[in-house]
Amino acid sequence: MALPDFTMHQLLEAGVHFGHQTHRWNPKMTPYIYGQRNNIHIIDLAQTVPLLHQALKLVSDTVARGGRILFVGTKRQASEIIADAANRSAQYYVNARWLGGMLTNWKTISNSIHRLRKLDKILAAEAQGFTKKERLNLERDREKLNRALGGIKDMGSVPDLIFVIDTNKENIALQEAKRLGIPVIAIIDTNCDPDDVTHPIPGNDDASRAISLYCDLFARAALDGIARQQGAMGIDLGAQVDAPVEPVLEEVEPVLEESAVLAVSE
């Protein structure tokens, strides 16, 4: 495998360059804003491209050395996409609600995960020895725990790197990661605060197409890391990380200028 590639056309087609209405913005995002059209801020994709590539490489490198990636996205349009990306890349996710202390109080979370595993075991054995009512209660307990912790029940300990969609909604996750010194890759829209993000990627964090593109790229980067790790163990998978595609960077500004005007006017 190789580090996933992407084109400026893909970013524009997914609407990555669309920010929020100009009155809904965070002034700290000024350096990442290209301009505005029809009262909508346009994100500077000339900055998004290299930052996204660097983040993909970081994910691949982290997984290649045995690290864990936690995908976080609990908003409606991100929930299923986040879970799918994490599952197909053998990583972990939180896509329902971030529980306070999920990182900083890992011991308590681990106890809840142990309870979830125990319920899985009991119900897999058809809850022998339990009444129908007791079984229903066990199933409800498992469903509740699985919704909150199912994506991290095999994680083992806190992650080595976190990928976040919507830093405003996942603010508690960011604060816990900062407290523990866990690096964070996050998509930062024009209404976000980039200060607590170690690896910011300016981009639309609301459009489903944009979220799907990000998650697909990061899932493939994690798979590339797995291939590299296995290759280092002597399994020849032909894994190799490609260098950044320079032509993409060269064509960023002219393409952005033309596409931004056309897209916003539609």
Curated annotation (Swiss-Prot):
CDD domains per record: RPS2
Entry keyword Ribonucleoprotein: yes
SUPFAM superfamilies: Ribosomal protein S2
Claim: S-adenosyl-L-methionine is one of the keywords in the record: no
Signal peptide: none
Keywords recorded for this protein, A-Z: Ribonucleoprotein, Ribosomal protein
Highest taxon of source: Bacteria
Molecular function, one GO term: structural constituent of ribosome
PROSITE patterns linked: RIBOSOMAL_S2_1, RIBOSOMAL_S2_2
One GO cellular component term: cytosolic small ribosomal subunit
A biological process term (GO) from this entry: translation
NCBIfam families: rpsB_bact
Similarity remark: Belongs to the universal ribosomal protein uS2 family.
Name of this chain's protein: Small ribosomal subunit protein uS2
Name of the encoding gene: rpsB
